[in-house]
Amino acid sequence: MVRRFGLIAVAAAALVLAIVSAASARPAAQAAATASCTKGVSIGMQAPITGPAGSIGSDQLHWAEFYFNQWNKTHKLKIHLVQEDTQLDPSKASTTAQALASNASVMGIIGPAGSDEVQAVAPIFRKAGLAFASGSATRVSLTSGAWKGYFFRDVPNDSVQGPTDANYMFTKLGATSGSSVMVVDDQESYSTGLADIVGQSLAGKGVKVDRESVSQKATDFSSLIAKVTSSTKVVFLPFQVASEAQLFAQQLQAQGKTAVAFGSDGTFDSSKFTVNGSYISFFAPDVTTIPADASVVKAFHKQFPGATSPFGAPNYVLAQAYANAVTKACKDNKISRAEVRKDFAKVSLPNTILGGPLRFTAKGDVAGAKFHIFKIENGKYVTIA
C-alpha cells in the first residue's frame, strides 16, 4: 500500500510538473488575462528611459505616470503602469516587449518611442493581442495596414512633417527655385523616410536637393560641410539623436557657412541641441505655453520638478485614452486585451492638453494633427509656426 501511494504521488508530481512546464512555455499570445476591474488593470510602457535619448524617454514616462497617478486619486478603478526601458534600441525593445506581452495583467501598451522600435515589437504585440500606441514614432509606413487595429499614434506622421518642413524652408528660409538644400539622413529608417519626403517636396518646388548620408555615430562632418555652398540655404537634419544635430550645426557655423541647420522632431531636445538660429519641427505644441494647460502643467511640475519637453505630453494623452478604453471595457464587463484594443480604437476625446481633440483614423493615425516649427533663440525653443 505504501509503495502504491508512493507511485501515485510520483505520477501526480510528474503531472503537475508537466502542467507547470507547459504553462510556462505558452507563448505570449495565449497568456490568459488576469486584469481585474476591482483589483486594478495594468498598462505597459516602453520608453528610452536611459541611453542617448534618456531625457526624452524620462519625460515620456513621467507624463504617463502623472496621468495615472492623478486618475487613481479620483477613480475606484485603479490603473497601474508597468515600465520597460528600451534605450532606443530595437533589440532591447523586442526583449522588453516579450516581457510585457507575457504579463497577463497588461491590457495595452504606451510606446515604444522610435519608428525602428515599433517595427521590432509589432509582431510581438500583435501576436499577444495587445494594442500599442506611440506618442513619438512618425514613420509613415507604420500605419500602412500591416498592424491595423493594433498600432496607433497620437502624433502626426512624416507625410505631414515632410511637406510642412519643406514648405517652411521654401516660404521663410529662402530655399526657392534655383537655390539648394542639403538633406542628410542618419541611415536609420525614420531618418531616411523623412529625408525622402522632404527631398521630394523641395524638388517639386524647383529647389536643388543635395542628398547625403552619415552614420548615427558620426562626429566629424567636415567632408559634408565642405559641400555646402553659398547657394545652400538650409541643411536638413532628420536625426534621432539631438547631440548629433548639435555637432553638425556647430561645425557648420565654425566653417563660416551661412546655411541654417534645420532639425526634425528626433532632434528636439533643448538640453542637447542648442545652436542659436537653428530650426526644429515637432509633432506637438509646447504645453507650457498653452494657457488652458496651466493648471495641469503646474501639477505636473509639483510631482516632477524641472524642465519638460513636448515629447512628454502626447504620452499623457495616450494614458488618458487608455483610461477611457479600460473604463468602457470594465463597464461592459468584458475586460480583456481584445476588448481594450477595440475600445481604444474608438476613443474620442473632445479636447486634450495638446490643444485639440483626439480621434484615430481607420489606419490608427491621429486625425487632424499638425507639425509645429520652433527656432532656437538664446538657448530657448520658440514656437514660430
Q: Where are the regions a protein language model picked out?
A:
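Extracellular/periplasmic bilobed ligand-binding domains
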Residues: 125-128, 194-285
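Periplasmic-binding protein-like
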Residues: 45, 100-113, 131-135, 179-185, ...
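Short, low-complexity disordered leader/linker segments with a strong preference
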Residues: 1-42, 74, 385
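Extracellular/periplasmic periplasmic-binding protein-like sensory domains
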Residues: 249-317, 330, 377, 381
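Beta-alpha junction/loop-to-helix N-cap segments that form part of ligand/metal-binding clefts
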Residues: 28-36, 55-62, 70-144, 154, ...
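Segments of small-molecule ligand-sensing domains
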Residues: 302-312, 323-380
